């Protein structure tokens, strides 16, 4: 019987390495796909490992700039913080991985794609809904969800089939990382009362180890896009990397979060997002300077919905596309400079300026340079308060009667 082709999202870890052998037993030829999202892995090694385990072909694609410009940028402009805390580190990368899986599957004539997600996480939903949106005719295989092995059984299978066991297998943590940040769960972190050990962190310093003097960064934006750091222009992916180092050194972006997963359970995760939290903070302050009141007050409602859609795996949904169009319209005048102080875990905005600033000092000042028409306030208050006044008059008459 002729073998079918499957494209596997391959990380180089135990689960997806074992999945190659498992899929071979199901009569598939496996094409491994590894994406460089800025996580810092030795991806050339990962690519070769897939071939050594049994893949017939192995792709390694650098998608850092695409991830930064088409995914992280939207998240920053929408100030996406799930449940007010989590900047959607993993949730942002899943639709891009799904997109590349579909592209390679179509290019290679594969009938299926596969991922290494378990049956109790959010990522299985994000991958499969995204794949269905992009190509509803592809079969989606989830080996880890299907085989239901314990960790010990999986290791035994790997040894029986000469699958290399990762040297970090004894680590209790499950880690996912990209340009936008790093997520960490499992091990002692599963106890919400336990303090995260310092070895749970990699991108940020503990507060007691951070510098005792603040560092200042000036972030330049053009139409809502971060373009410069301290006067130096960077591609967005490089700007994020550079800011991760600046802000991480000062302990910015550590997040300890018990979140409500899409699949109905609560999970405790630790995140490190130094650049993401700094950029979201700075961008919001520049919007406060450049957006009219009505847009500034309405936009958070759209932001919350965008955040939910991304978290829930609906990146390619019609509603998300429509809300993205609104978001892009709001960014036209979000151009300027924001000065941020990085110190002891905080990113504090200390200055902002823009050629599109709607702040008029002559109207805001209480000095002799004040140009605000104080006399206009009397008529404004009378008209603004008229409905309340009439309501009160009518109801007081009824009480008196």
UniProtKB/Swiss-Prot annotation:
Annotated binding of L-aspartate, by residue: 118, 122-123
SUPFAM superfamilies: Adenine nucleotide alpha hydrolases-like (SSF52402), Argininosuccinate synthetase, C-terminal domain (SSF69864)
Binding positions for ATP per the UniProt entry: 9-17, 116
GO molecular function: argininosuccinate synthase activity; ATP binding
KW Nucleotide-binding (keyword) present: yes
GO BP, sorted A to Z: argininosuccinate metabolic process; L-arginine biosynthetic process; urea cycle
Binding-site residues for L-citrulline, renumbered to this chain: 86, 122, 126, 174, 183, 259, 271
InterPro entries attached to this UniProt entry: Arginosuc_syn_C, Arginosuc_syn_N, Arginosuc_synth, Arginosuc_synth_CS, Arginosuc_synth_type_1_subfam, AS_cat/multimer_dom_body, Rossmann-like_a/b/a_fold
Pfam families: Arginosuc_syn_C, Arginosuc_synth
Keyword terms, alphabetized: Amino-acid biosynthesis, Arginine biosynthesis, ATP-binding, Cytoplasm, Ligase, Nucleotide-binding
Enzyme nomenclature, EC number: 6.3.4.5
Pathway in which this enzyme or protein is active: Amino-acid biosynthesis; L-arginine biosynthesis; L-arginine from L-ornithine and carbamoyl phosphate: step 2/3
GO cellular component: cytoplasm
Localisation: Cytoplasm
Chief location of this protein within or outside the cell: cytoplasm
Reaction catalysis annotation: L-citrulline + L-aspartate + ATP = 2-(N(omega)-L-arginino)succinate + AMP + diphosphate + H(+)
Protein family (similarity comment): Belongs to the argininosuccinate synthase family. Type 1 subfamily.
Record text on subunit structure and interactions: Homotetramer.
HAMAP family the record matches: Arg_succ_synth_type1 (MF_00005)
Name of the featured protein: Argininosuccinate synthase
